[in-house]
Amino acid sequence: KMKVLLAIFIGGGFGSVSRYGISILGTKLFDTKFPVGTLLANLLSCIVLGFLVAVFQDKVNAEELKALLILGFCGGFSTFSTFSLETLNLMKAGQYWIAALNVLISILACLFILYVFVQKSKVI
C-alpha cells in the first residue's frame, strides 16, 4: 500500500501545479470576474478523468498507475474547494447571478464532459 500512497502523493503534486498554471493562464486570457481558470481546470480534469476511467475500467493490475493518475493527478487538478470559495466570494460581493452561473455551468458542464469522455474512451 505504500506504493499506492506514494503514487497518490506524486500525482497530487503534479495535478496541483498544473491547476495553478491553468488558473494563471485563465486569469491572463480572460479579463472577467467569472472564475474562468477554475472552471477550465475542472473541465479539463473531467476530460482526463473520463478518459482514464474508461481506459482503466478492466485493468485490475494497474493499482499504482490508477492511484497516480486518477486519485493523485485528477484529485490535485480538480478544484472543488477553490470553486466553492470563489462562488462564496462572488455572493459576498453581491454578484449573485455570476455566482449562480458559476455553479450551474461548473456542475452541468463537468458532468456532461465526464459522461462524454467515459463513453468516447470506451471505443479506444
Provide a role label for each language-model segment:
Residues 1-124:
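Membrane-interface helix-loop junctions in multi-pass transporters/channels
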